[in-house]
Amino acid sequence: MKYDIIGDIHGCLQEFQNLTEKLGYNWSSGLPVHPDQRKLAFVGDITDRGPHSLRMIEIVWELVIHKKVAYYAPGNHCNKLYRFFLGRNVTIAHGLETTVAEYEALPSHKQNMIKEKFITLYEQSPLYHVLDEKRLLVCHAGIRQDYIGRQDKKVQTFVLYGDITGEKHADGSPVRRDWAKEYKGTTWIVYGHTPVKEPRFVNHTVNIDTGAVFGGKLTGLRYPEMETVSVPSSLPFVPEKFRPIS
């Protein structure tokens, strides 16, 4: 099986359409379909900050849950939106406010439909996907080699948030260790979460979050070809979001 793994979309629907078309997908049915049956895989954070978060929920739900032709691994923004939909006490900030504003503008029956679709998508998706006979792993923020196969709380925190130190940058964002430099496995780990200006290959890992929502690019990785394909963002460039990994 061949896969096209898509970086953090964050509600950037137009960029997602442009990227999938560049990857050879046809949208005539209203969904991206590849003539050679390649499958899409998402590294999470499909919502927040960008203009079309709810439409991205509908598309990914349709592909992953209804048609079962794609893979989705939730990100930290997905986790927070899930908790919001469950009625938990979450801070509506750091991008969630844009998704909530879209949601609250809907009539109640459409709100219920979106909520049910996202809860189903989140609950029926694993923390990470191990594909191609363990040669490929798709997740949100990365995973240590000794965590593969585990689903416990420590692994969940790592997969959703990365290798956080507990310290904070001046803007309040967490300081993260560069776990990829220590990775010695042969399974390719494809992930996102931390915006980089260009796809970052380190050992058998690839970070494909090229900051579409911050004016960078939306990137896909063609597997097993290991080729990256990108399209430019239509949004303003925010240079401070592309911080070097410490």
Curated annotation (Swiss-Prot):
Keyword list, A-Z: GTP-binding, Hydrolase, Nickel, Nucleotide-binding
EC id: 3.6.1.17
Superkingdom of source: Bacteria
Catalytic activity: P(1),P(4)-bis(5'-guanosyl) tetraphosphate + H2O = GMP + GTP + 2 H(+)
InterPro entries: Ap4A_hydrolase, Bis(5'-nucleosyl)-tetraP_PrpE, Calcineurin-like_PHP_ApaH, Metallo-depent_PP-like, MPP_PrpE-like
Annotated Gene Ontology cellular component terms: cytoplasm
Pfam families: Metallophos
Molecular function as annotated in GO: bis(5'-nucleosyl)-tetraphosphatase (asymmetrical) activity; GTP binding; nickel cation binding; phosphatase activity
Needed cofactors: Ni(2+)
NCBIfam families per the UniProt record, alphabetical: PRK13625.1
HAMAP family the UniProt entry points to: PrpE (MF_01443)
Task of the protein: Asymmetrically hydrolyzes Ap4p to yield AMP and ATP.
Family in the record: Belongs to the PrpE family.
Name of the protein in question: Bis(5'-nucleosyl)-tetraphosphatase PrpE [asymmetrical]
Species of origin: Bacillus cereus (strain ZK / E33L)
